[in-house]
């Protein structure tokens, strides 16, 4: 009987290596595919592509599978990195890993795998796929501490129908145990924590290679200038480290946080105290929407939402009829039961019904506890969405 062929995305890490081994043990015809998605010739200090490829080959030899490398650097720069820079230039904070999954790992990679005769693909992500009544659902991993469905919420029915996540039902600690037991050469390799395919280099230095510094005033909510920023693109909502302000600037002793950006005046607004009302939001509007099932929840539906990775699901009410829809495509709004901290434009708002990931969108704006005297641009995005 002909074995089902599965192409496994192998990064050189423990998770994808164990994924390949598990599928081989289950009787699949496994091919490993290593993706090079960044031209790192000038970045040897931070990119680990060469060592990662060596690890992939070593693992493939050990478990007895064929492996090949494919270069998606052009696709990555066109579909992911260009958008990444556009968002930062506009003062937002994008999540390139979300777009990388949708456009590279589960599009360019999937297409290439099909050309190799694969019936399905597999990756080392911690998530699950379930077929129910002819539809495919994306579910959280059993190990919620490692769940990665947040990064996968833009996958559609066609992509999920050809995807397996073998680690979705296995705790991370067990994956490490398996790697050690079968003697994987990378069993003790650290997990990657850098931006998708760009590595773990100092982020501000990296961004400065592509975006110019544009210094401007750093002000408090009452308009007092307390410092100078190097460029709005280099700061994100809720940021504490790297602002360059000491807690004693006005005598309160509390730490400073980035609270707003006024693009028109190139002003960065900062506040003191983690619980400052400018850092709390009860409502958000999101666009660039994607639904796993191809359709949104019903208006008024109760769901849980994450506005950042590893955040607990926050209870909220959903509405798909966000005013301003005609001007900018499909949008939705969420009203939370409790104020959420540092809801950041550019990040993803991902919706859940229990363990089922429904999909989500890119946060355009959030209504905070800012008073009426707040800078106009702080509310303009939300007003426009309305």
Curated annotation (Swiss-Prot):
Gene Ontology CC terms: cytoplasm
The enzyme's E.C. designation: 2.8.1.13
GO biological process: tRNA wobble position uridine thiolation
Keywords noted in UniProt: ATP-binding, Cytoplasm, Disulfide bond, Nucleotide-binding, RNA-binding, Transferase, tRNA processing, tRNA-binding
Primary site of residence: cytoplasm
InterPro entries in the record: MnmA-like, MnmA-like_C, MnmA-like_central, MnmA-like_central_sf, Rossmann-like_a/b/a_fold
GO molecular function per UniProt: ATP binding; tRNA binding; tRNA-uridine 2-sulfurtransferase activity
Region (Interaction with target base in tRNA): 95-97
Active-site residues, record numbering mapped to chain: 100 (nucleophile), 196 (cysteine persulfide intermediate)
Record field: catalytic activity: S-sulfanyl-L-cysteinyl-[protein] + uridine(34) in tRNA + AH2 + ATP = 2-thiouridine(34) in tRNA + L-cysteinyl-[protein] + A + AMP + diphosphate + H(+)
Site (Interaction with tRNA): 125, 347
Cystine residue pairs: 100-196
Pfam families named in the record: tRNA_Me_trans, tRNA_Me_trans_C, tRNA_Me_trans_M
Family the entry assigns: Belongs to the MnmA/TRMU family.
Biological role: Catalyzes the 2-thiolation of uridine at the wobble position (U34) of tRNA, leading to the formation of s(2)U34.
Name of this chain's protein: tRNA-specific 2-thiouridylase MnmA
Protein's organism: Burkholderia thailandensis (strain ATCC 700388 / DSM 13276 / CCUG 48851 / CIP 106301 / E264)
Classification of source organism: Bacteria, Pseudomonadati, Pseudomonadota, Betaproteobacteria, Burkholderiales
């Amino acid at each position: 009987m002909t074995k089902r062929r599965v192409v496994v995305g192998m990064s050189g890490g423990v998770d994808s290596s164990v994924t390949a081994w598990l599928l081989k043990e289950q009787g699949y015809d496994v091919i490993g595919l290593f993706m090079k998605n960044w031209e790192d010739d000038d970045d040897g200090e931070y990119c680990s592509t060469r060592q990662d490829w060596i690890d992939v080959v070593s693992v493939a030899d050990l478990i007895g599978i064929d492996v090949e490398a494919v270069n998606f650097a052009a696709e990555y720069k066109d579909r992911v990195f260009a958008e990444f820079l556009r968002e930062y230039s506009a003062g937002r904070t994008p999540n390139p890993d979300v777009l990388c999954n949708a456009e590279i790992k589960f599009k360019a990679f999937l297409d290439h795998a099909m050309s190799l005769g694969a019936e399905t693909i597999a990756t080392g992500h911690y998530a699950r796929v379930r077929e129910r009544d002819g539809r495919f659902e994306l579910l959280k991993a059993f190990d919620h501490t490692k769940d990665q469905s947040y990064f996968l919420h833009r996958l559609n029915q066609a992509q999920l129908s050809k995807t397996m996540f073998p680690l979705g039902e296995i705790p991370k600690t067990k994956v490490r145990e398996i790697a050690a037991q079968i003697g994987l050469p990378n069993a003790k390799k650290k997990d990657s924590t850098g931006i998708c395919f760009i590595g773990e280099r100092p982020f501000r230095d990296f961004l400065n290679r592509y975006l110019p510094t544009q210094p401007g005033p750093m002000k408090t909510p009452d308009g007092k200038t307390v410092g100078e920023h190097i460029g709005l693109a280099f700061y994100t909502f809720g940021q504490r480290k790297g602002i360059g302000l000491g807690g004693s600037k006005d005598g309160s002793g509390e730490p400073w946080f980035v609270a707003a950006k006024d693009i028109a005046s190139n002003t960065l607004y900062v506040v003191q105290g983690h619980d400052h009302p400018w850092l709390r939001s009860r409502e958000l509007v999101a666009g660039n929407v994607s639904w796993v099932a191809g359709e949104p929840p019903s208006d008024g539906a109760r769901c849980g939402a994450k506005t950042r990775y590893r955040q607990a699901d926050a209870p909220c009410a959903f509405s798909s009829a966000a005013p301003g829809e005609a001007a900018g495509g499909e949008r939705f709004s969420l009203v939370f039961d409790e104020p959420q901290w540092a809801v950041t434009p550019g990040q993803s708002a991902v919706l859940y019904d229990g363990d089922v990931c429904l999909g989500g969108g890119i946060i355009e704006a959030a209504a905070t506890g800012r008073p009426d005297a707040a800078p106009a641009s702080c509310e303009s995005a939300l007003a426009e969405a309305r």
